[in-house]
Every structure is written in C-alpha cells, then in structure tokens.
C-alpha cells in the first residue's frame, strides 16, 4: 500500500493501552462512569421520565466511540422487518448535518444539511427517515407524517435513554474497545458489561477479543461488495478486475478508514489511502488530485461527493451479512417481547 495522503484524525494513542496518560485521566473516567450509571438508574426508577412511543422501537447502537458498522446493520434490519410484514421508519441524530430541529430526509437531500448516514439510509431503504437531536421528537414527527409505520429503528442512540425501547442491538468492533476504559481515559461511552443487557450483540471484524461471555452469544457480521458504480453517474458499473494492475486512490471519511483500505487491498488493488475525519464535509478540492487515476470511496462518502465528483470517482457499495438466526431472534422478540430476566 502506497504512502498515505490526507488528514487522518486518529483516536488518541493512549486509548489503546493503560499507560501513563490514560492513568492520569482515569479519575475523570470514574466520574464519567458514576454519572452515567446514576443517569441509567434514574431512568429505570422512573425518576427521569422516558417517552414511550405507540409503536415498537429498536435501537441499533454501540458502547464505544468511532465507527462500528451501524449504518449497514440498520439497512439490513429494515430489509428484514419489511420482509416480515412490518412498516419501519428510521430516526437518527444527523451527525455532520447543519439542520436544527427535526427534519425529514429525502433521497434527493443534501448531506450537508441532514447528515451523510441518514441520507444514505434514505437512499438504501426507501423508508421514512427523520433526523433530530431530540430523538423522541424526531420519532413523533415521523409517526405523524407516516402513520403507517409500526416500528421505529433508531440509528445509534443506545445512550439516549429518554427514548424507551423494546429491543437493543449492539454492533461491536472489538478493535475499537481499546483499553476497555470509559471516556476520557478510553474509548467507551459505557462499560463492556452494558452489552450483557442488550438483546443481540453483532460482532464486526476479526481484530481484538470480546469477553468470553459475550463472544459465545455474539453473531458475526461482514460487509460485502461485488463491484463499483460511478459516483457522478451511478448507472456506470465496473468490477474490481477493471482496477487491477493500476494504482487506485481510496478516499474515506469514516470511523475506521483503514478497514476500507484493507478491504480494497484484499481485492488485489494497489491502494493509495486518503483518510479524512469521520463525517468530513468533502469539497471538490479534496478530490482534485491524480487526474485520470481511479478514486474509490464508500457509499457514505459518495452521497456527499456526488455533486462535484470527477468521472474517475467510484463508489464501493456494500451490504451487511449477519450470522444465521439473527433475524429470527430479532423478529421473535419484537413479536413476543423480551424473555424474563
């Protein structure tokens, strides 16, 4: 793989181990954990009120900061729900978007306004998608505009306890768990033990280890793709073989860009990586290099680059493949509720 070009914001190196700097911040992590635990208990005790929607709610989230692959899981989940006769809608915070308040996302929307992931989900699924920092308000607006919806899928929001939920799916990349400490000494928003209380743990990636009690019940996931399409003109298609023997530039503004670079390299491509921050607001200048050489990117970045993408920019669409039995477990619990604790 050739030398990297671009601005790569990485997670703090001290999140990977329990070294001196992490130890220095550990007291703050203890405080963070105490406050988070107190908040959870207040919601459980009813001292902080939750909003209970008149439909089922499924939260797809994570306990660590950074990318874990939630967006493809949400798209997969919506497909499973529709196949089973449900009428899902999606809510999201809209990270990276400028919208204030609640906004309905349409497939022809602007990622700079609604966020890249909600726009991608609107295009992938065709179901109603609403964004808003206030998730209960976003869900209420969705149900008012689309009363046929009978299940809400929350893209992220596991820690947004004000929204009551019927099911929780945690998408976990063990490599992002780092030193297993809470913020700011580590990358966790909640302790690993929080995963004991979710309905399904979906493991994405082979790096790192999960605690044995979680690894035994986690279902595997991988992202698969079989070709490329033009960013500016999606009707243009080509296979990976078209790029073999040529230098390609991989552009990624996602949580874990190295995974994308490695996936392309595993396909036999000579990759020059161009990492950018997660949710990066791309401009034409970001793609103004190496004219004539292919520029490959994820779907999440393609929705932002389409208005100005050159003809040599290609999207690599992927779908989530999740271990057998996962959909059945979700649908069973959705229909009949969680088993007694």
UniProtKB/Swiss-Prot annotation:
Pathway assigned in UniProt: Glycolipid biosynthesis; lipid IV(A) biosynthesis; lipid IV(A) from (3R)-3-hydroxytetradecanoyl-[acyl-carrier-protein] and UDP-N-acetyl-alpha-D-glucosamine: step 6/6
Class of this enzyme: transferase
One Pfam family matching this protein: LpxK
E.C. designation(s): 2.7.1.130
Annotated binding of ATP, by residue: 64-71
InterPro entries per the UniProt record, alphabetical: LpxK (IPR003758), P-loop_NTPase (IPR027417)
Catalytic activity: a lipid A disaccharide + ATP = a lipid IVA + ADP + H(+)
One annotated Gene Ontology cellular component of this protein: plasma membrane
Keywords: ATP-binding, Kinase, Lipid A biosynthesis, Lipid biosynthesis, Lipid metabolism, Nucleotide-binding, Transferase
MF terms (GO), sorted A to Z: ATP binding; tetraacyldisaccharide 4'-kinase activity
Lineage top rank: taxon: Bacteria
Transmembrane segments annotated in the record for this chain: none
UniProt keyword annotation of Iron-sulfur present: no
Keyword Nucleotide-binding: yes
Record-level GO BP terms: lipid A biosynthetic process; lipopolysaccharide core region biosynthetic process
NCBIfam families membership: lpxK
PANTHER family listed in its UniProt record: TETRAACYLDISACCHARIDE 4'-KINASE, TETRAACYLDISACCHARIDE 4'-KINASE, MITOCHONDRIAL-RELATED
Biological role stated in the UniProt entry: Transfers the gamma-phosphate of ATP to the 4'-position of a tetraacyldisaccharide 1-phosphate intermediate (termed DS-1-P) to form tetraacyldisaccharide 1,4'-bis-phosphate (lipid IVA).
Family recorded in the similarity comment: Belongs to the LpxK family.
Name of this chain's protein: Tetraacyldisaccharide 4'-kinase
Native source organism of the sequence: Azoarcus sp. (strain BH72)
Species classification: Bacteria, Pseudomonadati, Pseudomonadota, Betaproteobacteria, Rhodocyclales
């Amino acid at each position: 793989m050739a030398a990297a070009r671009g601005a790569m914001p990485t997670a703090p190196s001290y999140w990977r181990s329990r070294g001196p700097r992490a130890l220095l911040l550990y007291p703050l992590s203890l405080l963070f954990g105490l406050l988070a635990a107190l908040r959870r208990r207040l919601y459980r005790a009813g001292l902080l009120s939750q909003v209970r929607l008149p439909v089922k709610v499924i939260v797809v989230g994570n306990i660590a900061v950074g990318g874990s692959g939630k967006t493809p899981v949400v798209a997969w989940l919506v497909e499973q729900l529709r196949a089973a006769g449900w009428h899902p809608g999606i809510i999201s915070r809209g990270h990276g978007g400028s919208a204030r308040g609640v906004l309905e996302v349409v497939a022809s929307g602007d990622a700079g306004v609604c966020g890249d992931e909600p726009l991608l989900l609107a295009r992938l699924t065709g179901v109603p998608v609403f964004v808003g920092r206030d998730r209960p308000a976003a869900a209420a607006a969705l149900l008012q505009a689309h009363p046929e919806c009978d299940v809400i899928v929350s893209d992220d929001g596991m820690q947004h306890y004000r929204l009551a939920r019927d099911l929780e799916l945690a998408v976990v990349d063990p490599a992002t768990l780092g030193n297993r400490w809470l913020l700011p000494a580590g990358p966790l928003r909640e302790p690993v033990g929080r995963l004991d209380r979710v309905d399904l743990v979906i493991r994405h990636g082979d790096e790192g280890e999960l605690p044995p009690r979680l690894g035994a019940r986690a279902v595997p996931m991988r992202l698969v793709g079989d070709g490329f399409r033009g960013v500016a003109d999606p009707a243009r298609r080509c296979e990976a073989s078209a790029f073999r023997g040529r230098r390609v530039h991989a552009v990624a503004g996602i949580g874990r860009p190295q995974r994308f670079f490695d996936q392309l390299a595993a396909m036999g491509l000579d990759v020059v990586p161009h990492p950018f921050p997660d949710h990066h607001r791309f401009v034409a200048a970001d793609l103004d290099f190496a004219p004539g050489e292919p520029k490959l990117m994820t779907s999440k970045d393609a929705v932002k680059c389409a208005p100005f993408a050159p003809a040599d920019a290609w999207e690599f669409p992927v779908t989530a493949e999740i271990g057998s039995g996962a959909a059945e477990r979700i649908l069973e619990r959705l229909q009949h509720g969680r088993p007694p604790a």
